[in-house]
Amino acid sequence: MDVSNETVERTDLRTPLVDPADTEVKPLPEVGLESVLTESSLSYRRRVYLGACIELKVLFRLALPAILIYLVNSGMGISARVFAGHVGSQELAAASIGNSCFNLVYGLMLGMGSAVETLCGQAYGAHRYEMLGIYLQRATIVLALVGLPMTLLYTFSYPILILLGEPKTVSYMGSKYIAGLIPQIFAYAVNFTAQKFLQAQSVVAPSAFISAAALILQILLTWITVYVMDMGFMGIAYVLTISWWVIVGSQCFYIAVSPKFRHTWTGLSWRSLQGLWSFFKLSAGSAVMICLEMWYSQILVLLAGLLENPARSLDSLSICMSISALSFMVSVGFNAAVSVRTSNELGAGNPKSAWFSTWTATFVSFVISVTEALAVIWFRDYVSYIFTEDADVAKAVSDLCPFLAITIILNGIQPVLSGVAVGCGWQTYVAYVNVGCYYVVGIPVGCILGFTFDFQAKGIWTGMIGGTLMQTLILLYVTYRTDWDKEVEKARKRLDLWDDKKEPLQN
């Protein structure tokens, strides 16, 4: 079938995107977007207006719950540190080290799980519903296998922390805290694959409600274990692990019993054991892409500890990074939404819809990020007092706010384009771009400006902004030059390989 020249059936634009009375998940292409964009009798402005009305409705329905999910997931780690801080300063340091160490496996599992977005999203758009369950099982197996060496690594966290120069007391307490978090590794393996399985079908709100309920449960149980059962900071670790497994169990139960998924989840299958290596290669590219992005800002904070006034530099940069991370969650929500939209439309053979979804999400996220950046500049002299009462730190934060504003704007574009890459299956290519822009250009230039030319924190941040800007411009150019008809054909070939029971490979 020639999908690039296929005539898409016109639908009534008054038809709602999702029929409230329908209990079965329906594919997104049958909503009129492609027919609007290809309707020659309508003027260009009219097509854009009607297409935007359709797309924005879908986009925000996906992005808002996704933003809530990522905020809640971050909130679980933050609440654990808050309780640890009330137990004692050493406990806070141990919990902070433990959570920071677990960001490694969190980013790894989140990145590998994003491969499910590519395959499930395209299979769903192409009406290959039975393959979604196969992809879900295969991804869970691969991530669980990757979790085994990570478990071994965290089991020996004490000597590793000592080797990294941490104090013995903090290293010992941190290693005990990490031991209580180890079961989370396998919770991540199931959670992120199940979450992407749901997102590929535009089912996002249930995960948001489950995550919010788990956060409330975590806060309640942590209070009980710390103040009633007197379990100390180890009780905080145990409750955090239990809370993640509550999320996993709730999502799996929802998938198993909901009639929405009777076509996409048909039970366990031996087919999930086929092609594990090929899936690992695709998911490894996703993991590298996301991990390199997550670690980039952390390196900025680490380098600040080497400056002339490390305490003030660390405090000011940590405050700026906290604000940046909060705004970044909005972009990550749009990242998830555009990944679903792009993969769905490519799988359905709708090149114009995939193109329109890409640029609509990019524009909306850019506008939001500019608004956030302007707010940061406007309140630059006051925002730091949310975190500290130190006037010197507040002054340093105010001086860094222009750099923070630029970072926020770039972070409003770059994650969305990364979401497009996931939807199209470009993870490995973007990983190479990230390595070059971040670690070959951004960090070395930042070190030269910060240490050699003595621009201190501003110099380091300038170099890293340069790396992010270069990466963003490359992704913008690649996305602009994309032949969406060819991407549709690639998606079709990737899915057609399953008819021969072969593994769909990344193009």
Curated annotation (Swiss-Prot):
* GO molecular-function term, one example from the UniProt record: antiporter activity
* Keywords associated with the record: Membrane, Transmembrane, Transmembrane helix, Transport
* CDD domains according to UniProt: MATE_eukaryotic
Q: What is this protein called?
A: Protein DETOXIFICATION 39
Q: How does it sit in the membrane?
A: Multi-pass membrane protein
NCBIfam families, alphabetized: matE
Matching entries from InterPro entries are given as:
MATE_euk, MATE_fam
Superkingdom of origin: Eukaryota
Bilayer-spanning residue ranges: 58-78, 92-112, 141-161, 178-198, 209-229, 233-253, 287-307, 318-338, 359-379, 403-423, 433-453, 459-479
Similarity remark: Belongs to the multi antimicrobial extrusion (MATE) (TC 2.A.66.1) family.
What is a single cellular component term in the Gene Ontology annotation? membrane
Q: Which PANTHER family match?
A: MULTIDRUG RESISTANCE PROTEIN (PTHR11206)
* Subcellular compartments: Membrane
**For this UniProt entry, what is the primary localization, expressed as one broad class?**
membrane
Please cite one Gene Ontology biological process associated with this protein. Answer: xenobiotic detoxification by transmembrane export across the plasma membrane
